Structures are given as C-alpha cells and as structure tokens.
Amino acid sequence: MNEQQFIEALKKKGIELSEKQITQFKKYFELLVEWNEKMNLTAITDLEGVYLKHFFDSISASFYFDFSKVITVCDVGAGAGFPSIPIKICFPHLHVTIVDSLNKRITFLNHLSDELQLENMNFVHARAEEFGQNIKYREQYDVVTARAVARLSVLSELCVPLAKQGGYFVALKAAAGAEELKDAKKALTTLGVKLKEEYSFKLPVEESDRILYIFDKIKGTPKKYPRKPGVPNKTPIQ
C-alpha cells in the first residue's frame, strides 16, 4: 500500500486526510526507519509495509469505534506508537497516554511527538502492571487500547484496570482472537468488562484476518488487579 493508496483507502472509510496529516504520516515513516537502524522498533521497514501493516492497520480500529466521541486514550505497550499515534494523527483532539516498559522506545516516541507537533501526548516508562496500580492513571481513561501485545487473557489484566467505569477496552487481534476470547472469559468478567461488539475484517492488499473487540467497562476492577509484573503472563486469570 503506497501513500496514495493509503489516502484513498482512508477516504473510502470517511477519513479525509489534510496536507498536514499526510505530511505527518510521511515524517512518521521516515523517523521510524531512521531510528530503527539504532534500535529495534519494527521488523517492517519498507514503505508499503509500514503504510499497510502499521498505519492502516492501526487506524482500522476507528472504522468500528468512534474516536470522535471520546477524549482520553491509553495505549498499553505501544512500541513504536501503534495503534495510538496513527489514530491520534487522524483524530487530533485526543489526549493520548502511551505506557511502555522500554525506555529507549519512550525516547523515540518523545522525539516523534515533537517532530510531528502532536499535542496532548504523555509517554510513561513503566511496566503495565505497576502503571495500572498507580492511582494517577488507574480507571482514568475513556478508552484503553492495545495491538498484539499479549493474548487476551493477559492483555485484559494489563488494560482493563486503566479504563474508567463507562469507558471501553478496545483490542485489535489477528485471526487467533476468537480462541483467545474463549480463554479470556473469566478474566474479562473478573476485571469488570463485557463484550459490546466484535468485528471481523480483512486487511486490504494482503487479505489477512483481523478481529476488533470492543468491551464496555461496567464495574470497577478489583484492587488486586493488575497483579505484580510478570504474574499475569505466567498465570492468567482462569
């Protein structure tokens, strides 16, 4: 997917990019490739791959969830900024917090944000488990999202505690998502969310399967979650 195809594909979905936004994506691609030479940010570095598998794939969440109706977004383990920064470029009003456990990625994100002139961005170097127990961040966000960070039973424990009651947990998954959802039923109920909507679709060009899950936060998360760093991954809620 080249830049023009990317612009056209978004237009078909009702997102018309301004010149400023087109330039922001171009700059994002350049910085990603440049910084990737000194640190491992992504295995995908060709233009067509980045525009499809990082930019378009990230924004695809907004085809099914209306980001224009929310303000605060937290992205857990965003790595090089996916999915939240492409979403932020398309929806500039958003206040975005990204938490990542690797400080060098936070350094990249700070630089990226400055270069793209993004406002209302907050980057936090922390383990998601500790971040979710911090009262400054816990149950503070309209939307908590993550893309391919961990299986859903683990991911939900890292993300759901950050969503406010009445907020949402939005998870972008590949084809294995359906199996993961079954395994995560207990975790999702325990943490206080219920499945609102589920969308299956294909990423254009390569036709790979994607599933987007939107969960409603219907009650507060019990204080014991998230548990200590590493525990959710070793022993998911069952």
From Swiss-Prot:
Presence of keyword S-adenosyl-L-methionine: yes
A Gene Ontology term for the protein's cellular component: cytosol
UniProt superkingdom: Bacteria
InterPro entries registered for this protein in UniProt: rRNA_ssu_MeTfrase_G (IPR003682), SAM-dependent_MTases_sf (IPR029063)
UniProt-listed Enzyme Commission number(s): 2.1.1.-
CDD domains: AdoMet_MTases
Gene3D superfamilies assigned: Vaccinia Virus protein VP39 (3.40.50.150)
Binding site for S-adenosyl-L-methionine: 77, 82, 128-129, 147
Keywords from the named record: Cytoplasm, Methyltransferase, rRNA processing, S-adenosyl-L-methionine, Transferase
Chain's role: Specifically methylates the N7 position of guanine in position 535 of 16S rRNA.
Family label: Belongs to the methyltransferase superfamily. RNA methyltransferase RsmG family.
HAMAP family attached to this UniProt entry: 16SrRNA_methyltr_G
Protein name: Ribosomal RNA small subunit methyltransferase G
Name of the gene this protein is made from: rsmG
